[in-house]
């Protein structure tokens, strides 16, 4: 099964799960994601919060209780990095750079630090954390000597999101969230440091450290659904 078919299959499974939850639950949110991304790996700067590319996407949540919600999201962005932006003189001298389009599907659980019942309008904000699993699809890149090559194919990797956020009710039905999240991927190939093709054996960087990328931005969601009864939730 090709990477495109894998992405379609996983998207279908996740949407079936969401549809099932919608038919059996009470409080939902859906909306848009807007922000920026930056890469942390074997090329470029290593600052954790340094967005240099715009990102956008969508998000759906099922609020299972005032303290936790299940969610699924999609983000599209580019990951770019340039050794000349690094504080490491060895990277400055090397001078590598890359740019790769990336698409991410994420699903997992969001935990609120405070009780956050969407039908109690005096409850206006809460910090939260989110984690789960991500599926990232990115371009296959490799370096042929000092030249970056694009295979015009895509690869994919699973990963783990580690997200800290703050949500705030701005209107009766609208929630604005700000979050900063790291994505630890199970791949070290996003920046082209490990070629996907065995015919190109030029590698560089630390092969024991996988690639990371960050998302910093806003979620704006609309809430709907009848008032829930949380009395049976344990």
Where are these regions (language model features)?
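Outer-membrane beta-barrel translocator domains and adjoining extracellular loop/strand segments
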Residues: 42-47, 83-89, 120-123, 140-147, ...
């Amino acid at each position: 099964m090709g990477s495109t078919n894998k992405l379609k299959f996983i998207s279908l499974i996740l949407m079936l799960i969401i549809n099932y939850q919608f038919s059996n639950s009470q409080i939902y949110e859906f909306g848009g994601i807007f922000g920026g991304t930056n890469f942390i790996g074997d090329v470029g700067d290593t600052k954790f919060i340094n967005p240099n590319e715009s990102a956008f996407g969508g998000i759906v949540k099922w609020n299972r209780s005032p303290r936790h919600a299940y969610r699924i999201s999609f983000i599209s962005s580019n990951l770019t990095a340039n050794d000349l932006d690094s504080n490491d003189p060895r990277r400055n001298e090397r001078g590598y750079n890359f740019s790769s389009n990336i698409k991410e599907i994420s699903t997992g659980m969001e935990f609120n630090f405070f009780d956050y019942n969407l039908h109690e309008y005096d409850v206006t904000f809460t910090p939260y954390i989110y984690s789960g699993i991500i599926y990232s699809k990115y371009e296959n890149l490799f370096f042929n000597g000092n030249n970056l090559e694009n295979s015009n194919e895509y690869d994919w990797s699973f990963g783990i999101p580690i997200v800290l956020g703050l949500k705030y009710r701005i209107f009766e039905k609208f929630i604005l969230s700000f979050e900063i999240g790291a994505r630890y991927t199970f791949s070290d190939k996003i920046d082209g440091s490990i070629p996907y093709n065995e015919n190109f054996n030029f590698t560089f960087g630390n092969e024991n450290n996988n690639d990371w990328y960050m998302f910093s931005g806003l979620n704006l969601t609309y809430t709907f659904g009848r008032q829930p009864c949380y009395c049976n939730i344990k």
